């Protein structure tokens, strides 16, 4: 591809600086060579265009790698609008490169929560030829924010009083205010959106958790594909991606030497495993906290100390939350930490650390060091450093996962979007996982790039195992 952005005049975007488009295009060209799976799928479907004219809204970190995903969806026919799924994760040159080609994108690094949710609404607002405002036919979600907004808006139009209940957080208050405004400005809008909405593919653990909660309550409005639990996503993006990007975020934020430090990793799922491995590779002494006896045993078998967070206070130099749960690090924990401790999160949402409560605490001085690095000084003179306001440190303070591992995830996303559209009339309103043969195909598409040569089963060997020579090779219940 040409490394100079081909600018298409249009104003349907909100970004930081369109002049960054050429820089973004150069980095996109580099990323494409590191994303063999996604590019292979793009080439395979470029002529048939299985998503021709399908309206797709994306809510996913507006990075260089995501830009390659967006252009893949466009090349196979989709009509795309995009927003980021985090206020700090946008790479402004990536957003500019996409906006310059005529794709509506609404994202910049350092949005307020009000701006973030306005951008989400902009991304899911399509205009029909007759001027009617409607929504997407498919959604690419990361964390479930678009899915949440549509469901809550539709419930409001059908008598829900949720928006009138007291907000449990500042962000919930912002969402409720937005829904009230839409109810006045666009009566009946969410019913029109739901009428055409055919499905969602969800990228991350937290968003999948939301989907299953909605489905179990009997309120899921559309079929959903759980991309996160494809093996080539969770065991690669979550694990190997974090193994590289966590240390990158810490280094860029604090320029700190990790060797010899005591690092506390809260949670030992796939993200926790990658985070613990990242810190240990740099020579940190890693302590893991866990609620799950199986994960705790795994951590111990890997040689990590497994203990409670309370036992680490006063000796931990670095704290990383990875759980997808709330209130993992409380204000009381923060006050009891070692002077100059570094605190960050690599789970999707910002509620793993009690940031709102910290900001409301009397007698605490907040000093901004640089973007996404804040020092909090307590009354006793001790201080902690909070990175990215408790949001994703690898995207807030660095550039997220490398392109190669994201090619796995985004290949799955693209296949999920095609699958949802092709089966839009047969899928039920429940959560699906992509079939095993597609999981294996995604892996296969990445092997040549890294010099892997597979052994081939003989027919006799395949019969002995009870599998096809071409796979799938493992049953659905197999745990990789």
UniProtKB/Swiss-Prot annotation:
Disulfide bonds: none annotated. NAD(+) binds at residues 204-206, 238, 267-272, 290, 325, 346-348, 394. Its main location: cytoplasm. Its cofactor is NAD(+). It comes from the Bacteria. One of its GO terms (molecular function) is adenosylhomocysteinase activity. It is found in: Cytoplasm. Substrate binds at residues 63, 142, 203, 233, 237. Pathway: Amino-acid biosynthesis; L-homocysteine biosynthesis; L-homocysteine from S-adenosyl-L-homocysteine: step 1/1. Pfam families: AdoHcyase (PF05221), AdoHcyase_NAD (PF00670). Its EC number is 3.13.2.1. InterPro entries: Adenosylhomocyst_ase-like_sf, Adenosylhomocysteinase-like, Ado_hCys_hydrolase_NAD-bd, NAD(P)-bd_dom_sf, S-Ado-L-homoCys_hydrolase_CS. It catalyses: S-adenosyl-L-homocysteine + H2O = L-homocysteine + adenosine. Keywords: Cytoplasm, Hydrolase, NAD, One-carbon metabolism. One of its GO terms (biological process) is one-carbon metabolic process. GO terms for cellular component: cytosol. Gene3D superfamilies: Adenosylhomocysteinase-like (3.40.50.1480), NAD(P)-binding Rossmann-like Domain (3.40.50.720). Coiled coil: none annotated. Binds 1 NAD(+) per subunit. Belongs to the adenosylhomocysteinase family. May play a key role in the regulation of the intracellular concentration of adenosylhomocysteine. This is Adenosylhomocysteinase. It comes from Xanthomonas campestris pv. campestris (strain ATCC 33913 / DSM 3586 / NCPPB 528 / LMG 568 / P 25).
């Amino acid at each position: 591809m040409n490394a100079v952005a081909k600018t298409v005049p249009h104003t349907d975007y909100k970004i930081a600086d369109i002049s960054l488009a050429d820089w973004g295009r150069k980095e996109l060209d580099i990323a494409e060579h590191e994303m063999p799976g996604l590019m292979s799928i793009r080439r395979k479907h470029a002529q048939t265009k299985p998503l021709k004219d399908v309206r797709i809204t994306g809510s996913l970190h507006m990075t260089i790698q995501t830009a390659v995903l967006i252009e893949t969806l466009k090349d196979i026919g989709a009509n795309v609008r995009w927003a980021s799924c985090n206020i700090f994760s946008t790479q402004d040159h990536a957003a500019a490169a996409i906006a310059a080609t005529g794709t509506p994108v609404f994202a910049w690094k350092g949005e307020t929560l009000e701006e973030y949710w306005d951008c989400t609404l902009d991304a899911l607002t399509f205009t029909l030829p007759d001027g009617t405002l409607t929504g997407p036919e498919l959604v690419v979600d990361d964390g479930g924010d678009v899915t949440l907004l549509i469901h809550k808006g539709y419930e409001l139009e059908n008598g829900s009083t949720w928006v009138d209940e007291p907000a449990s957080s500042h962000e919930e208050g912002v969402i409720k205010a937005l829904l009230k405004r839409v109810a006045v400005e666009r009566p009946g809008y969410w019913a029109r959106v739901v009428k055409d909405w055919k499905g969602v593919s969800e990228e991350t653990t937290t968003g999948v958790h939301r989907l299953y909660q909605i489905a179990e309550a009997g309120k899921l409005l559309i079929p959903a594909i759980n991309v996160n639990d494809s093996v080539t996503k969770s065991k690669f993006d979550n694990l190997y991606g974090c193994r590289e990007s966590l240390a990158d975020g810490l280094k860029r934020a604090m320029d700190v030497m990790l060797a010899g430090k005591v690092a506390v990793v809260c949670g030992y799922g796939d993200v926790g495993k990658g985070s613990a491995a990242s810190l240990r590779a740099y020579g940190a002494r890693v302590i893991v906290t866990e609620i799950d006896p199986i994960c705790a045993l795994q951590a111990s078998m890997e040689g990590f100390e497994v203990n409670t967070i309370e036992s680490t206070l006063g000796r931990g130099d670095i704290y990383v939350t990875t759980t997808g749960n709330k209130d993992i690090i409380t204000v009381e924990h923060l006050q009891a930490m070692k002077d100059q401790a570094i605190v960050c999160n690599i789970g999707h949402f910002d509620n793993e650390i009690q940031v709102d409560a910290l900001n409301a605490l009397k007698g605490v001085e907040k000093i901004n060091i640089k973007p996404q690095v804040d020092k909090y000084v307590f009354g006793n003179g001790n201080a902690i450093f909070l990175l990215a306001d408790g949001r994703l440190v690898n995207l807030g303070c660095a550039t997220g996962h490398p392109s190669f591992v994201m090619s796995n995830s985004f290949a799955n996303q693209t296949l999920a979007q095609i699958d949802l559209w092709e089966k839009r009339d047969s899928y039920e309103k429940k959560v699906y996982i992509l079939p095993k043969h597609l999981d294996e195909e995604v892996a296969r598409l990445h092997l040549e790039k890294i010099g892997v040569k597979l052994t081939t089963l003989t027919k006799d060997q395949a019969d002995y195992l009870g599998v096809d020579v071409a796979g799938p090779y493992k049953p659905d219940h197999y745990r990789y």
